[in-house]
Amino acid sequence: MSYIPVVIEQTSRGERAYDIYSRLLKERIIFVCSTVEDHMANLIVAQLLFLEAENPKKDIYMYINSPGGVVTAGLAIYDTMQFIKPKVATLCIGQACSMGSLLLCGGEHGMRYSLPHSRIMIHQPSGGYKGQATDIEIHARETLKIKKLLNELYSKHTEQALKHIEKSMERDNFMSPGEAKKFGLVDNIISSRDAMALLHK
């Protein structure tokens, strides 16, 4: 069972306790730091919508350390990022693989960052299906549709030709932050808070 630190703050009404993630949410910081699946995606979407309702003009910061996960769950987060009014800055800490890399590059252009020792990985979607031959065929067609959609999204956010994206995603494609910047997945590599602040001036 994982332990989540609690922060105690003094208020006019006395002490108030927050878990660390809730306290950071007050600073408009959202963490995507586990496997992307439906439950966590719903929580991330809810946080994005809450921060938009609180202040639609103030930026949101999404910190990503994820191995990827379920495509539809990731697309729920991605679509919400594009839907809401605030700009969403993304920052890779550790890893942004598979759907994690789509969320990373889906941040506001010019506000997509990576720390210097992170790893980023893109690849085509995978699926393993059992059952009747007709059902397997249906799922295979759906996987190909999702592959085409993801290729188009990566092409849009990296400004790379679709053919180049298709070739680059045929197998697991691991990148350093420098390679990810050259590819168009991130805009800047930062090593300090001050460096990030300078880029926002």
Swiss-Prot record:
Keyword Hydrolase: yes
Stretches that traverse the bilayer: none
Gene3D superfamilies for the chain: 2-enoyl-CoA Hydratase, Chain A, domain 1
Keyword Protease: yes
Keyword terms, alphabetized: Cytoplasm, Hydrolase, Protease, Serine protease
Annotated GO MF terms: ATP-dependent peptidase activity; ATPase binding; serine-type endopeptidase activity
Subcellular location: Cytoplasm
Assembly information from the UniProt record: Fourteen ClpP subunits assemble into 2 heptameric rings which stack back to back to give a disk-like structure with a central cavity, resembling the structure of eukaryotic proteasomes.
Annotated protein name in UniProt: ATP-dependent Clp protease proteolytic subunit
Gene name of the encoded protein: clpP
